[in-house]
Amino acid sequence: MSDKPDMAEIEKFDKAKLKKTETQEKNPLPSKETIEQEKQTSES
């Protein structure tokens, strides 16, 4: 196998065959409210 990709293979690749997937955030950041609540509970 060669290191370089086969350009003919790339050119004939059909993007329409790719399935559209919904990206799901695995680890969403907490909201500002959540952060404030956690700060208040850790301070007391």
Curated annotation (Swiss-Prot):
<comment type="similarity">
    <text>Belongs to the thymosin beta family.</text>
</comment>
<dbReference type="InterPro" id="IPR001152">
    <property type="entry name" value="Beta-thymosin"/>
</dbReference>
<keyword id="KW-0007">Acetylation</keyword>
<feature type="modified residue" description="N-acetylserine">
    <location>
        <position position="2"/>
    </location>
</feature>
<dbReference type="GO" id="GO:0003785">
    <property type="term" value="F:actin monomer binding"/>
</dbReference>
<dbReference type="Pfam" id="PF01290">
    <property type="entry name" value="Thymosin"/>
</dbReference>
<dbReference type="GO" id="GO:0005737">
    <property type="term" value="C:cytoplasm"/>
</dbReference>
<feature type="region of interest" description="Disordered">
    <location>
        <begin position="1"/>
        <end position="44"/>
    </location>
</feature>
<protein>
    <recommendedName>
        <fullName>Thymosin beta-4</fullName>
    </recommendedName>
</protein>
<dbReference type="InterPro" id="IPR038386">
    <property type="entry name" value="Beta-thymosin_sf"/>
</dbReference>
<dbReference type="GO" id="GO:0005856">
    <property type="term" value="C:cytoskeleton"/>
</dbReference>
<comment type="function">
    <text>Plays an important role in the organization of the cytoskeleton. Binds to and sequesters actin monomers (G actin) and therefore inhibits actin polymerization.</text>
</comment>
<feature type="compositionally biased region" description="Basic and acidic residues">
    <location>
        <begin position="1"/>
        <end position="25"/>
    </location>
</feature>
<keyword id="KW-0206">Cytoskeleton</keyword>
<keyword id="KW-0963">Cytoplasm</keyword>
<feature type="compositionally biased region" description="Basic and acidic residues">
    <location>
        <begin position="33"/>
        <end position="44"/>
    </location>
</feature>
<dbReference type="GO" id="GO:0030334">
    <property type="term" value="P:regulation of cell migration"/>
</dbReference>
<keyword id="KW-0009">Actin-binding</keyword>
<dbReference type="GO" id="GO:0007015">
    <property type="term" value="P:actin filament organization"/>
</dbReference>
